[in-house]
Amino acid sequence: MIGKEENKFISFIKKNKFFASRKMGQNFLINENIKKKIVDSLEIKPDDHVLEIGPGFGALTKIVLSQTKNLTVVELDKRLVEFLKQEYKELRIINIDVLKFDFKEFNKDTQYKIISNLPYSISSKIIFKILKYANFSQSVLMVQKEMADRITAKVGTKKYNNFTVLLRITSEIKKLFDVSNNCFFPKPEVDSTVISFERKKDFDFTNFEKLESFLLKCFSQKRKTIFNNLKNYFPKQKIEEVFNKHSIIPTTRPENIKEELYLKMCFDFYDL
């Protein structure tokens, strides 16, 4: 049965001959129960400040606004910006590509929460930007299920990579629930997963870029050993020194090293 909000959505599409943009990764959430479940996961209080990335037709926006008026949305598609302006007169809308959005300056004196159904093609880039620059307390994001599986992958598995390690070291991550592709229009080819994450308080984020760079070196070629990957960037003597200190066998492959050990190695290689 089609609800009131779905009817409004379909009417707008027909009236405006709206076509979802593949380039922008537009798949709009239309399941009312899932919308509520996502927003409830963020545990919004009336005085909370919230940033929503890619609101689309306002699937989550309306529910968030019922819980706090301190909502800012970032939307690139001008067609959707016009729709949101008509629907939510007092909503603060920033019409910009989220990859160009200045997370560092936004609400820099007040922590805020982040909510989003992320575009699949750029979700990892957005997550990196959030972790690097955003002054956020908690984030609830919907990502491609495959990405969620990578984020939560166990050491020694094929999906365990530099992205996995970086997020594990810098943030507390929870896999909340899966979302069927039937909950979207147009229907994507894959299912999604909602995750929650927040920054770890014991990690010094001034070291984020060095850690990110180091992990890229370690996983530059997953089929090669950790030693062979690092020898292109560090002197052999330094590598042997660090490996001996942490009892690392040179023939170990990158996916077989725990995240805690990567952090220790990073500190030693860069003398942090």
Swiss-Prot record:
| Identification of the protein by name | Ribosomal RNA small subunit methyltransferase A
Residues annotated as binding S-adenosyl-L-methionine are 27, 29, 54, 75, 97, 117
**Enzyme class, spelled out:** transferase
Write out the catalysed reaction: adenosine(1518)/adenosine(1519) in 16S rRNA + 4 S-adenosyl-L-methionine = N(6)-dimethyladenosine(1518)/N(6)-dimethyladenosine(1519) in 16S rRNA + 4 S-adenosyl-L-homocysteine + 4 H(+)
Q: In the record, what terms sit under GO molecular function?
A: 16S rRNA (adenine(1518)-N(6)/adenine(1519)-N(6))-dimethyltransferase activity; RNA binding
Q: What does this protein do?
A: Specifically dimethylates two adjacent adenosines (A1518 and A1519) in the loop of a conserved hairpin near the 3'-end of 16S rRNA in the 30S particle. May play a critical role in biogenesis of 30S subunits.
Task: Tell me if rRNA processing is a UniProt keyword of this record.
Answer: yes
- What's this protein's family per the entry? Belongs to the class I-like SAM-binding methyltransferase superfamily. rRNA adenine N(6)-methyltransferase family. RsmA subfamily.
